[in-house]
């Protein structure tokens, strides 16, 4: 009965063994944040599932937990004024079945996203072109950096260009990032790195300590993304 949630936030359009990412789980999420493969005027996201029960629950939670979010015609009189709460006549538009959120997409963002989606193939081709150009450029510096190696089964969307600074490099990551930024090349570290070292997670109870996750530490100390 294990349920799988797939984080496909950064990689819409990517495939593994010919199957689209997001197709390997009960529920998958995709992000439309500003620097991701496509965006909805700077923000937004999507949950996808083939399970109608999960889809309805997601719609419910998205819209304050209101049951009217599941109606095809929420304004119809026969839907609205034929319900009671504790013997009180009520409006079905304002019955809250769950404690939910206000995460409904805007029409502007949706319109922006549709245009972006229609250009997805062109966007993916451009990102792959940039990946090959950057790979060829940085090959001359392999003595000091580790370049990304693509899995043979993967067709990658290249949300960004990642690499690691080796410990023997004659420069620090901080200095390289400042150099790039001063030349209008946007950089970022690899998100949280070892999340157990982040201030907000210091007191989280988990299996193992921060020092146990050596690969996460390597990412945190030496990882760079070129956006």
Can you name each region flagged by the protein language model?
Residues 41-42, 158:
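Short acidic, glycine/proline-rich loop/turn micro-motifs
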Residues 1, 15, 52-227:
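PLP-dependent aminotransferase class I/II
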Residues 5-41, 56, 94-95:
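Conserved active-site segment immediately N-terminal to the catalytic lysine
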